[in-house]
């Protein structure tokens, strides 16, 4: 008897992803620090290796380290761009016919291989530049975007009512927040008490358990309910893949097509800003004047991850008194406020207070996915989430690369510039949502519109 709950897989994968990101950044930071100059990095200190006096030679040295780390992150992200785009789009698109488990399994294998490589890299002190090669190879198996896309499609397959989709997706975001919050809070203690080697080994073990659960315990309703088993060549498969993507937009009426494109644009522009700025927080906190150590960085990550919990509570409460689109507006404008506050944060207290407006940052992610799923047919959910994941992979890598490049170029004269730029860029999804609102967005009316189009298609086929 197979289990139809994907939540345990999401739990383990979120733990691994949340722990990997800050650990890898700080590991690379320490390696570059030690290899760039003759300064030793003290891991027992209660403060970070950070000089606040601008006339000190160490201050110029740490600015150089910041630039090198930012550039290396840029190289890593670009190395996984093309294989990640191709694998994400293909794996999620074919999941409509071959089941949601396949992309979950392959992306989990890639994540496990990457974490094992991190263990070896740390234990044998291999050149850290080899991380670029592991990122490139791991991206061929899919990435976390592929995994989340498959999980969301898996959940949508089981939801019959539209309101149920919004709540269920919000529950997943809540679960992500709970895991990432606790993991982020403890990440500094992982480094301090266990070191990088054992921490990476724990990540690999959790990913191995996750893979075992998906392979042997998780059921696949799409594959089990599929009544046809068509064998086709590789070229025919690719043609069918792109044809279904084309038909997703072609079969829609003019108004629904316009709305679909507009919602995709809103989702990706918001994703671009939020994901692009995320890695900059750690570099910003390590640098002067904050000079945070690994424990404070863990606290900051935990506060950032708390937005998953507060976003879930916000969606749960707001869904009784307002539409999805109004919740998305709240999330965008509060995030914009947080970006501006972060840009001017110069003390630890100010930086913690700057995290408060980010409480509803995840709300737009949940409600925009839900809004998108409401304007397509049930048979188009897989290809829709493939498009979303493809655009998120492209947008995410481009965003991280862009923001790392901007931060590297501006850190010397004003580190907070990147956050001010992010606040300005958030006007794009806000304006786009205003246009959606002006088209008289109504969830029930679009449900009826889809039903009418489906009945028209059925009558055309009957004729």
UniProtKB/Swiss-Prot annotation:
Keywords: Glycoprotein, Lysosome, Membrane, Signal, Symport, Transmembrane, Transmembrane helix, Transport. Disulfide bonds: none annotated. GO terms for biological process: cellular response to 2,3,7,8-tetrachlorodibenzodioxine; vacuolar transmembrane transport. Coiled coil: none annotated. A motif (Tyrosine-based lysosomal-sorting motif) lies at residues 446-449. Residues 1-20 form the signal peptide. The keyword Hydrolase does not apply. One of its GO terms (cellular component) is lysosomal membrane. One of its GO terms (molecular function) is symporter activity. It is found in: Lysosome membrane. Belongs to the major facilitator superfamily. SLC46A family. The chain crosses the membrane at residues 74-94, 102-124, 134-156, 171-191, 198-218, 262-282, 295-315, 325-345, 348-368, 383-403, 416-436. It comes from Pongo abelii. This is Lysosomal proton-coupled steroid conjugate and bile acid symporter SLC46A3. Residues 21-73, 125-133, 192-197, 283-294, 346-347, 404-415 are extracellular. It is a multi-pass membrane protein. It catalyses: estrone 3-sulfate(out) + n H(+)(out) = estrone 3-sulfate(in) + n H(+)(in); 25-hydroxyvitamin D3 sulfate(out) + n H(+)(out) = 25-hydroxyvitamin D3 sulfate(in) + n H(+)(in); cholate(out) + n H(+)(out) = cholate(in) + n H(+)(in); glycocholate(out) + n H(+)(out) = glycocholate(in) + n H(+)(in). Its main location: membrane. Residues 95-101, 157-170, 219-261, 316-324, 369-382, 437-463 are cytoplasmic. Glycans are attached at residues 38, 46, 53.
């Amino acid at each position: 008897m197979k289990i139809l709950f994907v939540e345990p897989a999401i739990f383990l994968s979120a733990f691994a992803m949340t722990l990997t990101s800050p650990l890898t950044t700080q590991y690379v930071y320490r390696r570059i620090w030690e290899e760039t100059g003759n300064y030793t990095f003290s891991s027992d200190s209660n403060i970070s290796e950070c000089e606040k006096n601008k006339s000190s030679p160490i201050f110029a040295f740490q600015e150089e380290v910041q630039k090198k780390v930012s550039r290396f992150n840029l190289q890593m992200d670009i190395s996984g761009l093309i294989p990640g785009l191709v694998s994400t789009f293909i794996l999620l698109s074919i999941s409509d016919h071959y089941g949601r488990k396949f992309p979950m399994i392959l992306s989990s294998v890639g994540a496990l291989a990457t974490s094992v490589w991190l263990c070896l890299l740390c234990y044998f002190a291999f050149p850290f530049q080899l991380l670029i090669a592991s990122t490139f190879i791991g991206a061929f198996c899919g990435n976390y975007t592929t995994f989340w896309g498959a999980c969301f499609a898996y959940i949508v397959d089981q939801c019959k009512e539209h309101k149920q989709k919004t709540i269920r997706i919000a529950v997943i975001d809540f679960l992500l927040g709970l895991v990432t919050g606790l993991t982020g809070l403890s990440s500094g203690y992982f480094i301090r008490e266990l070191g990088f080697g054992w921490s990476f080994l724990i990540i690999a073990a959790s990913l191995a358990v996750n893979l075992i659960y998906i392979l042997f315990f998780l059921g696949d309703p799409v594959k089990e309910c599929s009544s046809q088993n068509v064998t086709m060549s590789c070229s025919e498969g690719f043609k069918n893949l792109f044809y279904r993507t084309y038909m997703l937009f072609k079969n829609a009426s003019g108004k629904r097509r316009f709305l679909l494109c507009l919602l995709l644009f809103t989702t990706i522009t918001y994703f671009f800003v939020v994901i692009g700025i995320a890695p900059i927080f750690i570099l910003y906190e390590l640098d002067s004047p904050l000079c945070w150590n690994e424990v404070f960085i863990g606290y900051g990550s935990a506060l950032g991850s708390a937005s998953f919990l507060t976003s879930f509570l916000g969606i749960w409460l707001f869904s009784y008194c307002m539409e999805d689109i109004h919740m998305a507006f709240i999330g965008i404008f509060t995030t914009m406020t947080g970006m501006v506050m972060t840009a001017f944060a110069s003390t630890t207290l100010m930086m913690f207070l700057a995290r408060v407006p980010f409480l509803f940052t995840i709300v737009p992610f949940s409600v925009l996915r839900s809004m998108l799923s409401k304007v397509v047919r049930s048979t188009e959910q897989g290809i829709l989430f493939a498009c979303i994941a493809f655009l998120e992979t492209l947008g995410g890598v481009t965003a991280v690369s862009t923001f790392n490049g901007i931060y590297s170029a501006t850190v010397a004269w004003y580190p907070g510039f990147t956050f001010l730029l992010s606040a300005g860029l958030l006007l794009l999804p806000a304006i786009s949502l205003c246009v959606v609102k002006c088209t008289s967005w109504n969830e029930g009316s679009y449900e009826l519109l889809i039903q009418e189009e489906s009945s028209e298609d059925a009558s055309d086929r009957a004729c």
